[in-house]
Amino acid sequence: MPTDCISYQKSGYFSKLIVDYLDKKPELKELYNYFPSIENFKHQIEEKNHNFKNNDKRKILVDALKKQYTNFEISELTQKNIVLLENEKTFTITTGHQLNLFTGPLYFLYKIVSTINLCKELKRNYPEYNFVPIYWMATEDHDFEEINHFNFKGKKLSWNTASKGAVGRLSTKSLTNFFTVFKAELGLSNNAEYIKKLFSDSYLQHSNLADATRFLANKLFGKYGLVILDGDAAALKKQFIPYIKDELLYQNSNKKVLESIAKLKDYSIQVNPREINLFYIEANLRERIIYENGNYKVNNTFISFSETEILKLVDANSEKFSPNVILRPLYQEVILPNLAYIGGGGEIAYWLELKAMFDFHKVTFPILLVRNSAVLINEKQEKNRQKLNITWQELFLKQQVLIDAKTKEYSEIKIDFSEQKAHLKKQFEALHQIALKTDKSFSGAVKAQEKKQTKGLDNLEKRLLKAEKKMHSEKLKKIIELQNNLFPNESLQERKSNFSEIYVEIGEELINKISDQLHPLAATFSIIKHA
């Protein structure tokens, strides 16, 4: 592995479940279909092809996409990809993401680029098929607090407005004040002016968050053929009617997901299923459906249906039913000729709870791929790293661990009292032998003294480490500064910084560099160096 790549397993930023999945632990095998490899896509294509024979589904999908792209400037490649979806030799690779303001954290870009690059790689290996990258916009989510902000140069910029219901339908009118604040942070460079125009064209020229996000993602990635899909569409929901009815009448998803969760007893569970994994959705409303006393009630409202009434509503207005985190993946795979889902560690963790549910419904389970991750580093930072003689493996360490390790490396004194502790232990072993031959009270005194002296050595070791840190404080300060720049708040850069921060520095080079250097099947953190 190149020195400017870190394996996910060694990065320290992934859960035990994801590490074991990447290591292909046999105990997880029944929780997924095929492991992500170029060879396994052949089997996935065959299986999905067999289970997605309905050409009406393809036509409905294409018609829905054409409708959603009305009034949007569309690239030649995206247009071609939409038309190709009617062809039974065309398959999709999908990633999903919330409608975070101005894309939110950097990893949004990595998700999209991972998806685009995997399509390219598959086309090289399976030229007889077509592969279309899909960005599934999470327009039906209702947790506005998760998406109403982003960080720019360490500052949290928030859009404060009242929000109810699905965020995709939320008006963007109140973003004018936010834009005034953001503009002031950006400066006056050519790249800053581009970012201002991009924000304004996206959010101030479109009336709702779904359209604004589509415009933005299309502007950034349209030339790569990205197709952006909004699942909040009546024509698409109609195809999901049998699954909505099954959920309301029999709650099979709850039963099947709980079966999978039982097999994950050694891991932290990402999401727990509800009895009914559906929301009722209207303008300014998205609330859970609860079955109570023979009726279907909409949580936190007075809306209630009998069984007959709700089944009629499903047939007449399936768009009023919104799948939650458990059922949304099923909805996605029912309406798309999809081969793989690309997501972060948390997303892949909850997908691993779902295979039994997919098997029950006889829907092909997609290949699960952990998205690409990266750290962006400029020339000055890279020079500092080399000057300080820090490896990338070291920079991924927790800060305290890193500083302790570098202090020991720089010190001319051995900051390790293991020998002294071993010598002390040996001395007390002799004393314990003497204690066995006399009164019990002496044995207690020996134990207490051993504990006291061992603790004393521990404290002296800590004091020595502290003293050496003072001796090398200048070097250590530079290490802390470098790590804080690359790992803000001791977290991953990709979770804290917005793309605009880097774009202001390097412009279009940002997306070009990411596109050139992210390899979807590599399962490594990429270190991307830029000007």
UniProtKB/Swiss-Prot annotation:
The UniProt record lists the keyword Ligase: yes
Record keyword Lyase present: no
GO molecular function annotation: ligase activity
Segments forming a coiled coil: 447-481
Domain of life: Bacteria
Keywords, sorted A to Z: Coiled coil, Ligase
Entry's EC annotation: 6.-.-.-
Signal sequence region: none
Family under the similarity heading: Belongs to the BshC family.
Protein name per the record: Putative cysteine ligase BshC
Species name: Flavobacterium psychrophilum (strain ATCC 49511 / DSM 21280 / CIP 103535 / JIP02/86)
